[in-house]
C-alpha cells in the first residue's frame, strides 16, 4: 500500500503543495542501510530546480546524538552542519535540492543499523524528460 501511495496522484499533489516545488513524479525509490563504519561525505546534487529529496527513517531506540541521520549543510563541509535529525524512529527529513542543499552522514562508530527509504520527487515531461536530464532526441551519426 505504501509503495502504491507514493506513486499516486494524491501523494504527488500533497507533496507539491507542501514543498511548493513543481514536482509531478517519483524518480527514485530505494532502501538504504548504513552499519558500523558507514558514512557519507557531504555532497550537493544540485540536479535541478524541481527536485525534492525525502529520507524516511525506521530505527527503534536510536540514541540522541548518535550519527546516522542525514545532516544538512549549506556547503560540502560537515563542520558547517546546520541540522541533523536525532530521532530516527519513524521520522523523516525532506529538503529541496539546490546549490546550497549539502548533506551527508557522520561516521557510524557503533554496531548499529540505520534503515531508511530514500525518495526523489521531480518534475518530468514526456517531451523533455526529467528536469535534470533532458531527453536527447537527436542521435549522433556513427
Residue ranges: model-predicted function:
Residues 1-28:
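Signature of the catalytic double-stranded beta-helix
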Residues 32, 37-38, 45-50, 58-142:
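Catalytic core of Fe(II)/2-oxoglutarate
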